[in-house]
Amino acid sequence: VFGCAKKENSTSSSNEETTISDDSSSGSMILSGKLAQGYVRGAKVLADVDGDGIRDSNESQGTSDTSGSYVLNADPGSWMLITSGGTFLDSKGNEVNALPMKAPAPTTSGATSNVTPLTSLVAANPSLKAKLDALGGDGWNADIASSSGVPGKLLRIAQTVEQTMMTLSTGSNAVLTTDSSKLKTLDKLADAFAMQENISSNEALAAATQEGVLNALNDENVVTLSADQKKIKGALVDATLVAVDSVTAAISDTSENVVETSVASTLEAALDNATSVVGTALNL
């Protein structure tokens, strides 16, 4: 599980394990921000130095509060923020398991470092930073769950990533079942988005999703598919495109702000539809 302690061998003391798994942080930089799909509460936030996604004793870790906020101290470096666990509330007030996300290390102390689907793309492919910044608002570091909203261009990209990932990782027919497979799929999506020009357009969102998902499903280092899942790769891609269509229908390609909660119920219904496509294909 990402952000949690590495398993110690049987000779390790329980005190050593507790020390590594408990939240603690130190360093000359103060960083804080929001974990946003909805606002993600109770998630571990790890300043991952060695890139393995598993907390070591020298790595700072915190937990997001009920408003999705976190605070950490860490030393400057090339580490990455990685989240694991946590939940957010859907439009009906039900808790939904959050996706793992990541974000680049900030370069200055005190800077706001949000962790969202957008920052996850940039952490995986830094060339996307300029493309997302060009879309307005706070660009790649936008708080996508803000009650003030964010430019529709940014929100539709964030929601395309989120709905695609949720389609493949929700319910009893989930294809992506580990944080590792989810984060590696995010990497594939980021590389596919980086190849698009007008990345918030309907065409770019569909093309990037199709390519990124196919590349993930075809890479055994990302996910090992069952025999039945291998037979329905096309249907799995189609299901994610159903989710993307719902995003582009609900969120205009606009520079005007759109509030995430205003489209949440529509996207939740569409996600149910997309995951049912996966279930139907597997049961044929």
Residue positions per predicted region:
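Feature for extracytoplasmic/surface-facing segments of secreted or surface-associated proteins
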Residues: C4-L284
